[in-house]
């Protein structure tokens, strides 16, 4: 193996300046989700919409009502209890954290 070629100080300085350091990673800013402006008071328009649309849903839960109808979670829970007592929807699974319903069929 041939010996390494000796570089002068000027050549070493030029080589050091040419390479440069790797730049630091730029952390991207997280996109912030806007605060939801859901309804918290049940007016007649919302009630009519709930009574009209919810019986057509195959899967009904609090989160489904919040997403589709733009209502608050507490209002969605009240609406689900009302629809269950009316016989419009029937429970599939109920426990303290999540209640899942489906539409009630006419044969039942």
From Swiss-Prot:
Keywords recorded for this protein, A-Z: Ribonucleoprotein, Ribosomal protein
Gene: RPS25
UniProt-listed InterPro entries: Ribosomal_eS25, WH_DNA-bd_sf
Top-level taxon of the source organism: Eukaryota
Organism field: Eremothecium gossypii (strain ATCC 10895 / CBS 109.51 / FGSC 9923 / NRRL Y-1056)
Cross-referenced Pfam families: Ribosomal_S25
Region (Disordered): 1-36
The name this protein goes by in its record: Small ribosomal subunit protein eS25
Biased amino acid composition, Low complexity: 1-20
Entries under Gene3D superfamilies matching the protein: 3.30.63.20
Compositional bias (Basic residues): 21-35
Record's GO cellular component terms: cytosolic small ribosomal subunit
GO molecular function annotations of the record: structural constituent of ribosome
Record PANTHER family: 40S RIBOSOMAL PROTEIN S25
Entry-linked SUPFAM superfamilies: Winged helix' DNA-binding domain
Similarity comment text for this entry: Belongs to the eukaryotic ribosomal protein eS25 family.
